[in-house]
């Protein structure tokens, strides 16, 4: 789809005033426009951090993150993530969402600014919820799709000009597998939401996740949205047999990292990220690794984290670990020997050391995990 008139106006005005920098040279070979970013977005330092807990956040949370060296928080507005066909009473959904936005406005943003942390505003559960296959219903029901677009218009109007926002993360892990309604497929629905944001706020970055639950593979067919300051996000939990071993099925076998018998190592993670790297280079895109993790009892979890972080650093990507003070299985402040065993608070462990080394810039492309 070609940029509409308002989009072209934003791009032209920015280029004429010198406020917009195009991160790649001209159009790409497929005719899509190169990504464009304002100078302040291009000048951001590397940002490293965590996913928020689902609960309200406290001063202690932010103090801990600052002490660790984190500079980025992905604030997830989440509830009923596993429910089927939830979040369909839109009046009630809006009341819940306003409550989360109030907490973001009154607590999260001020505390984050105080501690030098930028915040991603993440809509983790869309209006209309998910069907039994976890496909978002808004791709197949115009009522939910239209509501999604308009809620982002309201959010952008409310937070226009506010400091400390890394970007508006339009929807977490979108999944559209079946044919969508016209103008409601993954790309077009996110385009419509981005257009609504830009009608209210021409500057704050928009964060777009690839289809198939933010899959790196989906970057192969992704086209940039025709707006300034769009950041492209992926998640990596590969191989799932390692990162999620015995999380949903306690009878799964135990897998160690790395496992060369399966070809599971740093080079294999790098291979799965090739479509993201190609997209970044082709369009000059800013890229953000929004989620990665390995469950606490996975043998070699700390090596997996170091390998992921070293790749993010190699490619110049911001990143956030999943998750901070959420479930103990992901928490680096707990140690758990196996599923069903009690979680033990832990002030120091190999996974936490890996994460803090990452925050403090001590993991580079030349310093992956050691066997």
Say what each PLM segment does:
Residues 299-371:
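Aromatic-rich peripheral "rim/lid" segments of glycoside hydrolase catalytic domains that contact
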Residues 29, 142-263, 270-295, 314-320:
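Active-site region of glycoside hydrolase catalytic domains
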Residues 60-128, 186-201, 304-312:
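Aromatic-lined substrate-binding rim segments of carbohydrate-active enzymes
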Residues 23-95, 279-280:
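N-terminal carbohydrate-binding accessory modules
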Residues 1-9:
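Bacterial N-terminal signal peptides that target proteins for export
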Residues 81-101, 127-143, 176-178, 331-339:
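Surface-exposed, active-site-proximal loop segments in enzymatic domains
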Residues 9-19:
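Bacterial N-terminal signal peptides
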């Amino acid at each position: 789809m070609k940029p509409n008139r308002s989009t072209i106006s934003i791009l032209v005005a920015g280029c004429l005033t010198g406020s917009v920098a195009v991160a790649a040279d001209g159009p790409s070979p497929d005719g899509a426009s190169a990504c464009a970013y304002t100078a302040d977005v291009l000048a951001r330092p590397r940002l490293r951090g965590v996913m928020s807990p689902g609960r309200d956040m406290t001063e202690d949370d932010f103090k801990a993150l600052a002490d660790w060296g984190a500079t980025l928080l992905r604030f997830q507005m989440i509830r009923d993530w596993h429910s089927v066909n939830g979040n369909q009473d839109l009046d009630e959904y809006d009341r819940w969402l306003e409550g989360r936005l109030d907490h973001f406005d009154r607590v999260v943003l001020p505390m984050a600014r105080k501690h030098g942390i930028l915040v991603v505003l993440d809509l983790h559960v869309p209006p209309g919820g998910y069907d039994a296959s976890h496909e978002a219903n808004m791709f197949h029901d115009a009522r939910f799709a239209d509501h999604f677009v308009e809620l982002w218009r309201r959010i952008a109007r409310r937070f226009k000009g506010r400091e400390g926002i890394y970007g508006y993360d339009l929807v977490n892990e979108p999944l559209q597998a079946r044919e969508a309604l016209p103008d409601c497929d993954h790309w077009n629905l996110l385009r419509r939401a981005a257009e609504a944001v830009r009608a209210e706020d021409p500057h704050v970055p928009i964060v777009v996740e690839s289809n198939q639950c933010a899959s790196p593979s989906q970057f192969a067919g992704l086209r940039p949205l025709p707006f300034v300051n769009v950041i492209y996000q992926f998640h990596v939990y590969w191989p799932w047999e390692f990162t999620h071993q015995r999380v949903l099925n306690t009878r799964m076998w135990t897998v160690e990292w790395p496992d060369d018998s399966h070809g599971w190592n740093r080079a294999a993670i790098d291979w799965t990220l090739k479509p993201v790297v190609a997209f970044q280079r082709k369009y000059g895109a800013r890229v953000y690794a929004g989620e990665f993790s390995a469950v606490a009892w996975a043998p070699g979890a700390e090596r997996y984290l170091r390998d992921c972080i070293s790749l993010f650093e190699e490619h110049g990507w911001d990143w956030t670990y999943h998750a901070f003070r959420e479930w103990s299985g992901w928490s680096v402040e707990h140690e758990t020997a196996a599923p069903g065993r009690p979680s033990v608070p832990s002030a120091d462990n190999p996974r936490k050391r890996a994460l803090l080394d990452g925050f403090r810039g001590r993991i580079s492309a030349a310093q992956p995990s050691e066997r």
